[in-house]
Design a protein with these regions (language model features):
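Carbohydrate-binding surfaces of carbohydrate-active enzymes
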Residues: 71-85, 89, 97-113, 118-129, ...
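Noncatalytic carbohydrate-binding groove/subsite architecture in carbohydrate-active enzymes
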Residues: 122-216
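A cross-domain feature marking catalytic cores of carbohydrate-active enzymes
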Residues: 1, 33-37, 113-115, 147-149, ...
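An active-site-proximal structural segment forming one wall of the substrate-binding cleft
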Residues: 13-35, 54-108
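The substrate-binding groove and active-site-proximal loops of carbohydrate-active enzymes
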Residues: 1-15, 53-76, 112-126, 159-166, ...
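Aromatic-lined substrate-binding rim segments of carbohydrate-active enzymes
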Residues: 1-46, 50-51, 133-138
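Short, solvent-exposed loop/turn and secondary-structure capping segments
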Residues: 5-6, 34-36, 42-47, 123-124, ...
C-alpha cells in the first residue's frame, strides 16, 4: 500500500497514515502503531510488498547475507513511516493547532516491532528483531516498543506481550516472573477469527470474550481487543493462514469484532464496554 515500487512511497488517500492517527487522537483514543514490516497473515504477504520477492536470493524476516536487501528495504520503509508520525507520539510536544483531546503531541502510546515472529533462534532474534527495534529508535520512536512473540525470544530494547485464547490467568501470572520489569499485556484478545473461503463462519459469543477478559484482569494484566472493528480486505489484499496454502482469507475481515464490518454495535460490543468500564474504574485495585 505504502511502497508499491522500491523507494516510491505514498501516504495519500487510503494510505494516509498520518491523518488516520490524527483522527484517533481527535476521537480521544490512544494508538498502538504496528508498522511492521510484517504485520500479520490477514494481509497478503503479511503486508510486505510483493517486489521484495524479486530480489535475487532474498530471504524475508531474517538477518543473514541473503536478507540484506530485505533489511535495507525495511530500514527505508520504517524511516518513511516514522517521518509521518514521530510528532504524533504522546511524548512529543503538543502543537498549538491540534485537534487531539489528549495530552502530548498525539495518540501513539506504543509501537510494535514486527509481529508473531515465532522462531526458536536466539541469534536471529537479536540480529533481526533487534535491528527492527533499532530502526524505529533511530528514526524517532520515543514510546515503548513491544514485540508480540509470546516470549519465544527476548529482544533488547523492547518488552514482549501475550496473545492466546486459553489458560490466560495462569500464563499471565507467570509473566510476572519471566518479565518482572514490564507490564503484563495481552496485545491481541481475538473475539473471533478471520473467515476463509469455503469454510463456515467461526462464531465466538460475548460470554466467551468476557471470560477471557475477566481472566486477564484477574491476573492484574491489561488487554487490547483485536479486532475491535474488522473492516474489509478490499481487492486482493486478503492474506492466507499458515496452516495450508489454500487457507485464503475472505474479503470480509469482520472477525466477530465488537463493531461489525458495517460499523454497527453488536452484543460483543456491549459486553466488552461493560467490563472495560469496570476495569478503568478499579484498575488500581486489580493491578
Amino acid at each position: 500500500v505504502h511502497e508499491t515500487e522500491p523507494g516510491e512511497f505514498s501516504f495519500e488517500d487510503e494510505a494516509d497514515l498520518r491523518h488516520f492517527v490524527q483522527l484517533i487522537g481527535a476521537e480521544g483514543m490512544y494508538c498502538i502503531l504496528r508498522p511492521g514490516p510484517y504485520v500479520g497473515a490477514s494481509w497478503d504477504l503479511g503486508g510486505l510488498p510483493p517486489w521484495l520477492t524479486t530480489i535475487p536470493g532474498v530471504t524475508l524476516r531474517q538477518s543473514n547475507p541473503a536478507a540484506q536487501g530485505f533489511l535495507e528495504a525495511s530500514a527505508r520503509f520504517l524511516g518513511a513511516v516514522m517521518e509521518q508520525v514521530k510528532d504524533l507520539q504522546l511524548t512529543a510536544p503538543a502543537p498549538p493547532d491540534t485537534e487531539s483531546t489528549l495530552p502530548g503531541g498525539g495518540p501513539i502510546v506504543m509501537m510494535q516491532a514486527e509481529h508473531a515472529w515465532f522462531c526458536h533462534h536466539p541469534a536471529q532474534a537479536q540480529t533481526y528483531l533487534g535491528e527492527i527495534v533499532r530502526y524505529l529508535r533511530e528514526n524517532g520512536c520515543e514510546v515503548p516498543i513491544i514485540v508480540g512473540n509470546n516470549f519465544w525470544q527476548r529482544v533488547d530494547g523492547a518488552f514482549d506481550t501475550w496473545s492466546a485464547d486459553e489458560h490466560l490467568a495462569t500464563d499471565l501470572r507467570q509473566m510476572r516472573l519471566v518479565q518482572p520489569e514490564a507490564p503484563r499485556f495481552v496485545s491481541e484478545v481475538q473475539c473471533g477469527q478471520p473467515d476463509h473461503w469455503g469454510e463456515p463462519h467461526e462464531h465466538r459469543s460475548a460470554a466467551w470474550c468476557l471470560n477471557r477478559l475477566g481472566q486477564i484482569l484477574s491476573a492484574g494484566a491489561q488487554y487490547n481487543v483485536h479486532m475491535f472493528h474488522g473492516g474489509t480486505n478490499f481487492g486482493f489484499n486478503g492474506g492466507c493462514s499458515d496452516r495450508s496454502r489454500d487457507a485464503l482469507i475472505t474479503t470480509s475481515h469482520d472477525c466477530g469484532a465488537p463493531l461489525s464490518e458495517a460499523g454497527d454495535t453488536t452484543p460483543m460490543y456491549w459486553a466488552v464496554k461493560r467490563i472495560s468500564m469496570f476495569a478503568s474504574q478499579f484498575g488500581q485495585v486489580l493491578a
